[in-house]
Design a protein with these regions (language model features):
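FIC/Doc superfamily catalytic core
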Residues: 1-332
Length: 332
């Protein structure tokens, strides 16, 4: 069953803007290993801080580096577990209940007795005044609801960006675990995004959620009250765009931005379609690029030569053996 939400013009606009931003980031993110690790640590710190973990970013960094830190043992263990979960989860299948439970086991081992298992009793979410603000699904329905959600997510053809927000929201509403639901919802959205664009493995979306956590919780509550996640989806897409643009500011030194921006919009879309093949293979031929983009051979050849002239691609070989490869961004 399709979860209740509407696809709005605002969502589609944000989806286009995010796609354009991450196309540039995909070209850059592997270049800076230090920045990648720093962003993962920021993600872990922020996701735990949202759940009231009081350790500072500096303390979290030290714990992950294996150093001794003064702090509550439970909070230190949360950091260690989260780091292990983030290191492993991007190998997982986002539509597998077994993998969801395995990730929860990594996230909560040594912290809760029900680690790696769906809850078997009712649970409520309370605000600071002790008022119940949300009641999770009855325990006997949890497995079926998660199963239905994952089956829908696997089959749907809506954009991955929107789908990831829907899954995040629905997991929070189902509240399948006794503890760790918020961390798992955010982690699972990251996994879905990374399966679409690997750069999302390193974009610290949680840092922006932490920054806007009041609105985050308000829109979860609105979606719960209205039984419709539309406003939450729009909010999360804004967060993802802000995170992508923030990350981009730290990677502009790679030199891709200026070169890609010199392409016309139709040429940028052409490049976005052939980029995965360029990245994961030994290059691309004119024929293959034409097949992937639906362009004619002559148009494809012209676009490829434009990319060569901008030092984005390099032409290798002659005549029938000619193919195109990505230039090493580190040289520019």
């Amino acid at each position: 069953m399709r979860p209740p939400f509407s696809i709005t013009d605002k969502m589609l606009k944000l989806t286009v803007e995010i796609t354009q931003a991450v196309t540039l980031l995909e070209l850059q993110h592997q270049r800076d290993l230090h920045l990648r690790k720093e962003n993962r640590i920021r993600s872990i710190h922020s996701s735990l801080a949202i759940e009231q973990n009081t350790l500072s970013l500096e303390q979290v960094t030290a714990i992950i580096a294996g150093k001794r830190v003064l702090g509550e043992p439970k909070e230190i263990r949360e950091v260690q577990n989260a780091y292990e979960a983030y290191e492993e989860v991007f190998k997982f299948d986002p539509y597998s209940i077994e993998n969801l439970l395995a990730a929860h086991r990594l996230m909560t081992k040594g912290l809760v007795k029900e680690s790696g298992a769906f809850r078997e009793r009712d649970v409520g979410v309370y605000d600071g005044n002790g008022t119940v603000v949300h009641i999770g699904a009855r325990p006997q329905f949890v497995y079926g609801l998660v199963d239905d959600l994952f089956k829908w997510a696997k089959k749907t053809d809506i954009p991955a960006l929107i789908k990831s927000c829907v899954v995040h929201f629905e997991l929070e509403m189902i509240h399948p675990f006794l503890d760790g639901n918020g961390r798992m919802g955010r982690l699972w959205q990251n996994l879905l995004l990374a399966k679409w664009q690997p750069v999302f493995e390193w974009i610290p979306i949680e840092t922006l959620v932490y920054k806007h956590q009041k609105q985050y919780y308000e829109l979860l509550a609105v979606g719960d009250h209205e039984n419709d996640s539309t406003k939450f989806i729009e909010f999360m897409l804004e967060i993802i765009l802000e995170a992508s643009l923030t990350y981009s500011k730290h990677t502009k030194q790679a030199g891709w931005d200026d070169r890609i921006k010199r392409l016309r919009e139709v040429e940028q879309k052409f490049f976005a379609k052939i980029y995965p093949t360029l990245r994961y293979s030994q290059g691309i031929t004119t024929s293959k690029a034409a097949e992937l983009t639906g362009k004619t051979q002559s148009t494809t050849r012209r676009y490829l030569l434009k990319l060569v002239s901008l030092d984005v691609l390099e032409a290798v070989g002659k005549n029938k053996d000619r193919h195109y490869v990505l230039r090493d961004t580190g040289k520019h």
